[in-house]
Amino acid sequence: MKKTFKLILVLMLSLTLVFGLTAPIQAASDTAVSNVVNYSTDVIYQIVTDRFVDGNTSNNPTGDLYDPTHTSLKKYFGGDWQGIINKINDGYLTGMGVTAIWISQPVENIYAVLPDSTFGGSTSYHGYWARDFKRTNPYFGSFTDFQNLINTAHAHNIKVIIDFAPNHTSPASETDPTYAENGRLYDNGTLLGGYTNDTNGYFHHYGGTDFSSYEDGIYRNLFDLADLNQQNSTIDSYLKSAIKVWLDMGIDGIRLDAVKHMPFGWQKNFMDSILSYRPVFTFGEWFLGTNEIDVNNTYFANESGMSLLDFRFSQKVRQVFRDNTDTMYGLDSMIQSTASDYNFINDMVTFIDNHDMDRFYNGGSTRPVEQALAFTLTSRGVPAIYYGTEQYMTGNGDPYNRAMMTSFNTSTTAYNVIKKLAPLRKSNPAIAYGTTQQRWINNDVYIYERKFGNNVALVAINRNLSTSYNITGLYTALPAGTYTDVLGGLLNGNSISVASDGSVTPFTLSAGEVAVWQYVSSSNSPLIGHVGPTMTKAGQTITIDGRGFGTTSGQVLFGSTAGTIVSWDDTEVKVKVPSVTPGKYNISLKTSSGATSNTYNNINILTGNQICVRFVVNNASTVYGENVYLTGNVAELGNWDTSKAIGPMFNQVVYQYPTWYYDVSVPAGTTIQFKFIKKNGNTITWEGGSNHTYTVPSSSTGTVIVNWQQ
């Protein structure tokens, strides 16, 4: 009897190691559709609503707005929310492993057709030419249709993210009020104003940006789009109330358009208003070109309270897998540098193409698409897949990259790569939360390991479509055993054998091959993988996700101060933020048995509700290399720490040198003290005289203007 039991045990252990799992893993609460502040366990599918499926022909536009032949690429094609509902219900999206959809901005857009000789007219099919942020685009559907989309998605464990573009309304001309709809803005049907004769100052009127500076891109128009003045109290309150309309509908996330082109301070206070009302995961669009690194981009990701689309990731993946203009060393360097630069790397939204870029597939072999998808789905961050990528759609540039969805074939290799790898984000926390370590590399081969506690995923990619490589000297954190390819050989992967010292038996990685091997284990010690939101206030609730927390409540420490536990289970803890000195905190967790977790760093606890105030200083003359910054006695102004001072301030568009200005998020209803400083490298020159004082308004926006004190 004992021998029989031992034999069964050995067989069970052998099967366990072959499949790479120690035990069946049940769905964890951190992966639930209700967890709207954590998308690390999700796969997003980006949909240009008008170009996906026409599910209700009765709401299609008429006349010159609409092209039923789907050839005039800047006209409406008829895609709508009912079409998305249909593809959820028929299993196309769920079958692919999609757990979140990002849809076009749902608000009412202009009805004008702009002249366009190439495409026979240009319309607002894309959703970015808003006229009323509190009404729906009728060509996408009604509020009832939108609610049906939300309900259907949630019933299928899919989160819904909306695009939202508070930077602008629609095309307008300063000199021709008849052009398009003159950028007019409506509040639930009531006209607020248009771009010409803008006596209330709802818009910026500084001309179009030439993208020459960060400041220029913020306060001047993007192309011919009427640029909203968020510092105007009416616009500020309007945009904050508008997003609440959609939050009340039950959306689960927000993608903010053109965050590079709006004031950082206003966006931070806008984000605070969202987090105070109904926190949801929010990420912004800040375009970066190939090999571009922008300190303002990094600062925004770390300090704004929202995440960003990871253009550094996207551009490098395209260089390596699509264009062959860089090697795997460049890919690995990007993974390392972004992990160093971005505080919340697992919140960065990764992608290989989108509606503003050439589609990834450009003909020829489809294997580069499949390799890039596999890399994105197994890398850190939140993967977003552009509609049609799984069908190998092509198209260089707008609008060719926004054609009508061509097929819903569930047999393509790309579809099945996604289908097999997407579920790993929920079943293996190494994929959702793990660190990344390069294990073997040459110009064409990248073998990397994701690890979270005892959970491991090892991924091997050979981008060379004609050359195989012998892999020797490979080590891994996978326990001893034989591991099958999670992809089941879909991209020619095979099994590997791991010895007790972590060495992998040498093997051949064939041309174009991709393989994924994994090990999933329950955790007996606490490990934090995600905290959200990353910007909060005393009394608000944040969510801590990870493994090994146990089922009995312990403690969550903000530095050394414990918060009040709201709920506690083995993978997710909700805790109220304690009343502590505002600033950045490292969070740790202590289980009921006394085990202490890792720390999760840089959670920003604000002084209070935020208001955007424009700080202006006159007569601040500088020498070459000097810039003016702002500091003060609250955490939002750096608490007099010059290394945390706000700036460099601007001096070209709204005001001109020697006047400097900056829009800053500061605590509402608070009397603050502040001063300006000049920085030139490590040299700091303080403003003279007494501290300036200012009482921040309790709501709306503010402006304070002072003279530089000698």
UniProtKB/Swiss-Prot annotation:
Residues that coordinate or bind Ca(2+) 1: 54, 56, 59-60, 78, 80
Enzyme Commission code(s) on record: 2.4.1.19
GO cellular component assignments: extracellular region
Reactions performed catalytically: Cyclizes part of a (1->4)-alpha-D-glucan chain by formation of a (1->4)-alpha-D-glucosidic bond
Cofactor: Ca(2+)
MF terms (GO), sorted A to Z: alpha-amylase activity; cyclomaltodextrin glucanotransferase activity; metal ion binding; starch binding
Residue(s) at site: Transition state stabilizer: 356
Native organism: Thermoanaerobacterium thermosulfurigenes
Stated name of the protein: Cyclomaltodextrin glucanotransferase
Keyword match Lipoprotein: no
Binding positions (Ca(2+) 2): 167, 218, 227, 261
InterPro entries linked to this entry: A-amylase/branching_C, A-amylase_C, Alpha_amylase, Carb-bd-like_fold, CBM20, Glyco_hydro_13_cat_dom, Glyco_hydro_b, Glycoside_hydrolase_SF
Statement: the UniProt record of this protein carries the keyword Transferase: yes
CDD domains: AmyAc_AmyMalt_CGTase_like, CBM20_CGTase, IPT_CGTD
Any GO BP: carbohydrate metabolic process
Family, as annotated: Belongs to the glycosyl hydrolase 13 family.
Cofactor note text: Binds 2 calcium ions per subunit.
Role of this protein: Degrades starch to alpha-, beta-, and gamma-cyclodextrins, as well as linear sugars.
Active site: 257, 285
Domain CBM20: 605-710
Broad EC category: transferase
Principal localisation: secreted
Residues bound to substrate: 128-129, 168, 221-224, 255, 260-261, 355, 398, 402
